């Protein structure tokens, strides 16, 4: 629990050290929810530090203890998709999250983004539209993804509208600004 407290206070290095020690204490009869959460947080921290291979190992361990940990499934799937790695696995994990929580805009956005990475743009458009309908935060990332998806389906007017909304919502990405200026999709 010390590691969780450190993580919540953004003391990520200390939290990672604590979790690594804690993982050494895991027994076969340990509480699977707690162990899964330990590994999930480790995965998040390792990803933030740019240690993606280690992060993915932590997520794999997390899911061995609790295969339906939706937060870990979503994060793992999204991080794989951003790297354009193992998209079939990412899609399977993400699909589990939208089945568990069909109106969760974050999960819908992740699933749409994976479909985008797989060049399944029309399907991606269906899920990003659902994400936007359910997005109470009006996330700049979701809006940028929507713009990217619409651009790839040939609807530049809609793409520009979403990119502009993303920019107005506080997204400061230099790539986003180029997309708007050049009126075309640009990969990150």
Question: Where are the language model's segments positioned?
Answer:
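TPR alpha-solenoid repeat register
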Residues: 32, 38, 72, 107, ...
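Residue-level detector of the short coil/turn that links helix A to helix B
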Residues: 10, 50, 84-85, 119, ...
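Short coil turns that delineate tetratricopeptide repeat
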Residues: 27, 67, 102, 136-137, ...
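Position-specific recognition of the canonical hydrophobic site in helix A of tetratricopeptide repeat
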Residues: 7, 40, 47, 81-82, ...
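Canonical tetratricopeptide repeat
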Residues: 1, 41, 75, 110, ...
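Residue-level recognition of tetratricopeptide repeat
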Residues: 4, 44, 78-79, 113, ...
């Amino acid at each position: 629990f010390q590691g969780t407290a450190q993580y919540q206070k953004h003391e990520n290095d200390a939290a990672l050290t604590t979790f690594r020690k804690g993982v050494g204490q895991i027994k076969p009869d340990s509480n699977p929810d707690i162990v899964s959460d330990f590994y999930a947080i480790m995965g998040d921290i390792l990803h933030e530090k740019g240690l993606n291979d280690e992060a993915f190992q932590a997520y794999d361990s997390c899911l061995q203890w609790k295969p339906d940990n939706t937060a870990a499934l979503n994060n793992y799937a999204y991080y794989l998709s951003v790297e354009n790695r193992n998209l079939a696995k990412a899609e399977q994990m993400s699909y589990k999250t939208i089945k568990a929580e069909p109106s969760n805009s974050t999960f819908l956005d992740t699933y749409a983004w994976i479909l985008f990475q797989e060049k399944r743009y029309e399907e991606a458009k269906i899920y990003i539209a659902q994400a936007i309908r359910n997005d109470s935060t009006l996330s700049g990332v979701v809006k940028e993804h929507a713009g990217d998806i619409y651009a790839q389906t040939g609807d530049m007017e809609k793409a520009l509208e979403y990119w502009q909304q993303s920019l107005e919502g506080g997204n400061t990405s230099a790539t986003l600004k180029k997309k708007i200026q050049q009126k075309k999709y640009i990969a990150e």
